[in-house]
Every structure is written in C-alpha cells, then in structure tokens.
Amino acid sequence: RLASQGSFVSGGANLQPEFQALLGRVGKSLSASKGKMRVEGHTDNVPVAYNGRFKSNWDLSAQRSASVAQFFINESGFKEKNVTVAGFADTRPIARNDSAAGRAKNRRIEIIVDGK
C-alpha cells in the first residue's frame, strides 16, 4: 500500500519524480516474482474539480493505477499480460473521510502480487 502524498499532483495522474524513485525500488524488489500483479487506485470522497481530463474519482483512480502499471511495465520489465489495473474511487476507504488525515489515508495505490 503506497500513500498518494507526493505521488501525484492533486487531481492529476502523472507520477511525481520522488514517486518514480520509490516505484523503481518497489519494482526491483518485485521483479523476481513470476506471478501476476494488480495495481489498484483509490481516492477520497472529495469530488474531482472537472478540468477536462477526469470527470470523476473513478476516472482519476483508474488513470493513476494505469500510470503506476505502465511504469512497472516500462521501467521494471513486467510483462503487460501479467499486470492488471483497477480504479475504485472512494468505494473502499481505509479511514473515515471526515478529516484531512483520513482523506489522505484513502488516497492511495495498492499493489497486489500473486506469487504463483
């Protein structure tokens, strides 16, 4: 589970340089796995300010997970057939959304690896 603070610009899906460095380390440690990887994007419940790119938190969470998956494919050598993405928007919170701290916990990327 990777917190999104510093991972993406607010309301965006481009990977920030610091997050790319972290993903590089994660990718290196996971590269020996022969299993499948699922990258899940999650958001808080604050509606996306429509900027022409993302219509909703569904769009945003899906694109963020796709950005992370694409990084693993391009930079860490994962095969496309072994990587899937999912965007869950605010449907799977791990904290309450009634505080800034809770919302920050809910904005995250989760990487699930099936080591089979």
Task: Walk through the language-model features, giving the residues of each.
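Periplasmic OmpA-like peptidoglycan-binding domain that tethers envelope proteins to the cell wall
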Residues: 1, 7-22, 29-32, 42-116
